[in-house]
C-alpha cells in the first residue's frame, strides 16, 4: 500500500483522519459502482436498509446483504463482485488498524478486527442524520465522495456533545469508536436532480472483533 499520512486525535475523543485515501484507480472503481446505485429504485429508505427511521431521511444500501447469501450452514460470499467491497479492504490494512489501536486504550482491539459490514449512503437536498450512537458496533469508518465542482452545502459530520465538527472532504476517511455520538448536518443543494449524483456519498464501514 502506498504511503498515507494520517492525522491522529485523542481529543475530544480518539479518531483518525486520512485525506486523499484512495488512489485514482481505486476512485474510478468506487465511482463506477456509486453511479450504478444512483438510479431510481436502487437506494433504499431507512426502514429498508437497517437505518434508524426516526433519525435519518437519507437513502442507502447494505452492500453485504446484496453480496452475501446466508442460506444453510455456509454463506455464499460474492463480496469480490463489488468494486467497493474489494477496494475498501484498504481501510483494514494492518498499519491503519494498529495506528487506531494505539490512540487510546478504548481502541486497543481495533488491530484485532476480523469482521466488517459496509453501507453506501447518499445524501441529497434536505437529507440528514440526527445524532445517534452505533452502540452495537466497536468501530466506524466513514469515507466521503462527491462530484466536483462541489454543488452542495452542509453534510458535515458533527458531534454535539463535544461541540466538534469534521468536514466531509472528498476522498477522506475518518475512523472512530462506535460509542461516540455523531450526526450528519442537512445537505442543501440547488439546481440538481436527485439522480445526477451531485450529493454527498458516504461509504460507512462498521467493524470489530467477533469470536
PLM features: what roles do these ranges have?
Residues 137, 147-211:
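Catalytic core of Fe(II)/2-oxoglutarate
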Residues 2-104:
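Non-heme Fe(II)/2-oxoglutarate
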Residues 39, 107-111, 149-151:
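Proline-centered turn/helix-capping motifs that create local helix->coil transitions or kinks
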Residues 25-27, 114, 127-130, 183-185, ...:
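Short catalytic/ligand-binding loop motif for oxyanion handling, primarily in non-cytosolic enzymes
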Amino acid at each position: 500500500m502506498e504511503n498515507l499520512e494520517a492525522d491522529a486525535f485523542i481529543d475530544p475523543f480518539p479518531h483518525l483522519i486520512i485525506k486523499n485515501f484512495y488512489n485514482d484507480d481505486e476512485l474510478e472503481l468506487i465511482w463506477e459502482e456509486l453511479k450504478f446505485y444512483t438510479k431510481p429504485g436502487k437506494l433504499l429508505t431507512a426502514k429498508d436498509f437497517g437505518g434508524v427511521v426516526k433519525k435519518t431521511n437519507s437513502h442507502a444500501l447494505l452492500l453485504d446483504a446484496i453480496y452475501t447469501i446466508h442460506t444453510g450452514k455456509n454463506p455464499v460470499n460474492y463480496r469480490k463482485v463489488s468494486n467497493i467491497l474489494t477496494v475498501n479492504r484498504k481501510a483494514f490494512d494492518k498499519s491503519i488498524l494498529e495506528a487506531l489501536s494505539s490512540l487510546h486504550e478504548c481502541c486497543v482491539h481495533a488491530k484485532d478486527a476480523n469482521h466488517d459490514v459496509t453501507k453506501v449512503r447518499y445524501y441529497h437536498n434536505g437529507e440528514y442524520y440526527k445524532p445517534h450512537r452505533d452502540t452495537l458496533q466497536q468501530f466506524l469508518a466513514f469515507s466521503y465522495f462527491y462530484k466536483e465542482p462541489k454543488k452542495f452545502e452542509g453534510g458535515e459530520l458533527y458531534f454535539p456533545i463535544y461541540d466538534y465538527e469534521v468536514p466531509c472532504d472528498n476522498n477522506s476517511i475518518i475512523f472512530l469508536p462506535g460509542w461516540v455520538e455523531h450526526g450528519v448536518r442537512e445537505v442543501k443543494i440547488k439546481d440538481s436532480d436527485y439522480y445526477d449524483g451531485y450529493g454527498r456519498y458516504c461509504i460507512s464501514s462498521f467493524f470489530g472483533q467477533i469470536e
